Amino acid sequence: MDYLDLGPYSSASGTVRLPGSKSISNRVLLLAALAEGETTITNLLDSDDTRVMLDALGKLGVRLTRDADTCVVAGTRGAFTARTADLFLGNAGTAVRPLTAALAVNGGDYRVHGVPRMHERPIGDLVDGLRQIGAQIDYEQNEGFPPLRIKPAAITVDAPIRVRGDVSSQFLTALLMTLPLVKAKDGKIVVEVDGELISKPYIDITIRLMERFGVTVERDGWQRFVVPAGVRYRSPGRIMVEGDASSASYFLAAGALGGGPLRVEGVGRASIQGDVGFANALMQMGANVSMGDDWIEVRGIGHDHGKLDPIDMDFNLIPDAAMTIAVAALFASGTSTLRNIASWRVKETDRIAAMATELRKLGAVVEEGPDYLVVTPPQRLTPNATIDTYDDHRMAMCFSLVSLGGVPVRINDPKCVGKTFPDYFDRFAALAKA
C-alpha cells in the first residue's frame, strides 16, 4: 500500500488559495446542463467527484468544453438527449443523488452505479420520494441502495412529496433541483420533510444556486418547500465556484496548531457554504481567527499554555468540517464532545467508527456512540502512528494535522484525497515547517 510520512513539524504559516467547492461544483454542473443557454464556469473543482459528473453528463449528450481555467456547458433546456446510458459515478454522493432524480423524470432507460462503498450508501429515501410522483426505479442488488435501474415513466404530481431529512440532505437537494422540470396542475410542487433535516446549510447552497439559474424555491422553516413546476432553468452566463469551505478547515486548524499566521483565500463572510462555521468552532476552542469577505486567517491559540480549549458542540450543521475538530481535540486541554454527527455513519466510510479507531492509535481515549464522539487527548501523542484512511479523503486530510504536534505520522493511501483535493499534501507541506 502507498503511504506518506509527515513531520514532525513545529509550525505552519503562509497563504493557500482553495480549490473550488465540491458541493457547489457538482450542483452547478447539473444546473448548467439542465438550463437554457450556455454557462461558463470558473474555478470548477478538478477532482474524482467532479470528473465522474462531467463524464456522466457527456454520456447523457451534454456538450462540454474544458480548459485550464473554465468549463463551458451547453444547456439541454431541461432534457438529456441520450435516452439510454450506463453511468459509473464512483463514490460521489453529490453526483449519484441529484442525477438519479434528474434521470427519473427524463423518460429514458439508465443504469446508475459506483464503487462498492457507494453500493452501501443509502438512497432509498430519495427513491421513495421519486416513486411518489410515478418514477420507475428498481434496485439491482440490495433494497435501498445502488446500483439502480431507471426506466421511462409517466410522472404526475397530485399531492405533496414527502422525504426523510434525517439521513442525508442530498435526498432533498436532489428533489429540489429536479422538480422544476416536472409539470403540475397548479404550477407548484410541495415537498415536506419528515424528521429533523440535517446539514441544513447544504440545502441553503442548493436553493441559492437554483436562484442563480432563475428558479426560486419558497420554504416554510426547514420542513416545507414549494418549488415552481414546469419551468426552465436559465443560464446566468458566467458563474464562479467559490473555494471549498470543508477543505479550508484543515488549513485553519493548521494555523491554530502551528501558530500561523495562516490565511485561506476563496471563502469568508460572503460564502454561501455552511462549513465556514468551522471558524467559529475553532474560535470557541481558543484560536485567534479573523475574517474578510473571501478570506479567513488564523494566528495560533490565544492561551499561554498553547493548548486548545475542549469543545462540546452540536455539529449537525457542519458534519464534514467537524471531522477536523475531532483531530484538533487531540490538542485540547480536556475532553471534547462532538454531538449530532449520525450522518458520519453513511459517508465515504463509517466515519464515527474510523475516527475512533485512528484517534486511539495516537493515544486518545475515545467513546463512540450512535451519533456522537467523546475524545480525551493523551498527555503526549503517540509518535510514528500509522493512520488508515478507509478510501476516505477527509480521513487522510484530517490526520495530516497530527504532524504539527511534534511527532511523525504515516498516512496510508494518501492518494484518496483525489476525491476532492488532489494536491492537498503538496499544499500542506508548503506551509508546515520543522
Swiss-Prot record:
<comment type="similarity">
    <text>Belongs to the EPSP synthase family.</text>
</comment>
<feature type="binding site">
    <location>
        <position position="320"/>
    </location>
    <ligand>
        <name>3-phosphoshikimate</name>
    </ligand>
</feature>
<keyword id="KW-0057">Aromatic amino acid biosynthesis</keyword>
<feature type="binding site">
    <location>
        <position position="169"/>
    </location>
    <ligand>
        <name>3-phosphoshikimate</name>
    </ligand>
</feature>
<dbReference type="Pfam" id="PF00275">
    <property type="entry name" value="EPSP_synthase"/>
</dbReference>
<feature type="binding site">
    <location>
        <position position="27"/>
    </location>
    <ligand>
        <name>3-phosphoshikimate</name>
    </ligand>
</feature>
<feature type="binding site">
    <location>
        <position position="351"/>
    </location>
    <ligand>
        <name>phosphoenolpyruvate</name>
    </ligand>
</feature>
<feature type="binding site">
    <location>
        <position position="170"/>
    </location>
    <ligand>
        <name>phosphoenolpyruvate</name>
    </ligand>
</feature>
<dbReference type="InterPro" id="IPR006264">
    <property type="entry name" value="EPSP_synthase"/>
</dbReference>
<dbReference type="InterPro" id="IPR001986">
    <property type="entry name" value="Enolpyruvate_Tfrase_dom"/>
</dbReference>
<feature type="binding site">
    <location>
        <position position="168"/>
    </location>
    <ligand>
        <name>3-phosphoshikimate</name>
    </ligand>
</feature>
<dbReference type="GO" id="GO:0009073">
    <property type="term" value="P:aromatic amino acid family biosynthetic process"/>
</dbReference>
<feature type="binding site">
    <location>
        <position position="93"/>
    </location>
    <ligand>
        <name>phosphoenolpyruvate</name>
    </ligand>
</feature>
<protein>
    <recommendedName>
        <fullName>3-phosphoshikimate 1-carboxyvinyltransferase</fullName>
        <ecNumber>2.5.1.19</ecNumber>
    </recommendedName>
</protein>
<feature type="binding site">
    <location>
        <position position="419"/>
    </location>
    <ligand>
        <name>phosphoenolpyruvate</name>
    </ligand>
</feature>
<comment type="subunit">
    <text>Monomer.</text>
</comment>
<dbReference type="InterPro" id="IPR013792">
    <property type="entry name" value="RNA3'P_cycl/enolpyr_Trfase_a/b"/>
</dbReference>
<comment type="function">
    <text>Catalyzes the transfer of the enolpyruvyl moiety of phosphoenolpyruvate (PEP) to the 5-hydroxyl of shikimate-3-phosphate (S3P) to produce enolpyruvyl shikimate-3-phosphate and inorganic phosphate.</text>
</comment>
<dbReference type="GO" id="GO:0009423">
    <property type="term" value="P:chorismate biosynthetic process"/>
</dbReference>
<dbReference type="GO" id="GO:0005737">
    <property type="term" value="C:cytoplasm"/>
</dbReference>
<feature type="binding site">
    <location>
        <position position="23"/>
    </location>
    <ligand>
        <name>3-phosphoshikimate</name>
    </ligand>
</feature>
<feature type="binding site">
    <location>
        <position position="22"/>
    </location>
    <ligand>
        <name>3-phosphoshikimate</name>
    </ligand>
</feature>
<dbReference type="InterPro" id="IPR036968">
    <property type="entry name" value="Enolpyruvate_Tfrase_sf"/>
</dbReference>
<keyword id="KW-0963">Cytoplasm</keyword>
<feature type="binding site">
    <location>
        <position position="22"/>
    </location>
    <ligand>
        <name>phosphoenolpyruvate</name>
    </ligand>
</feature>
<keyword id="KW-0808">Transferase</keyword>
<keyword id="KW-0028">Amino-acid biosynthesis</keyword>
<feature type="binding site">
    <location>
        <position position="121"/>
    </location>
    <ligand>
        <name>phosphoenolpyruvate</name>
    </ligand>
</feature>
<dbReference type="GO" id="GO:0008652">
    <property type="term" value="P:amino acid biosynthetic process"/>
</dbReference>
<dbReference type="GO" id="GO:0003866">
    <property type="term" value="F:3-phosphoshikimate 1-carboxyvinyltransferase activity"/>
</dbReference>
<feature type="binding site">
    <location>
        <position position="394"/>
    </location>
    <ligand>
        <name>phosphoenolpyruvate</name>
    </ligand>
</feature>
<dbReference type="InterPro" id="IPR023193">
    <property type="entry name" value="EPSP_synthase_CS"/>
</dbReference>
<feature type="binding site">
    <location>
        <position position="199"/>
    </location>
    <ligand>
        <name>3-phosphoshikimate</name>
    </ligand>
</feature>
<feature type="binding site">
    <location>
        <position position="170"/>
    </location>
    <ligand>
        <name>3-phosphoshikimate</name>
    </ligand>
</feature>
<feature type="active site" description="Proton acceptor">
    <location>
        <position position="320"/>
    </location>
</feature>
<feature type="binding site">
    <location>
        <position position="347"/>
    </location>
    <ligand>
        <name>3-phosphoshikimate</name>
    </ligand>
</feature>
<comment type="pathway">
    <text>Metabolic intermediate biosynthesis; chorismate biosynthesis; chorismate from D-erythrose 4-phosphate and phosphoenolpyruvate: step 6/7.</text>
</comment>
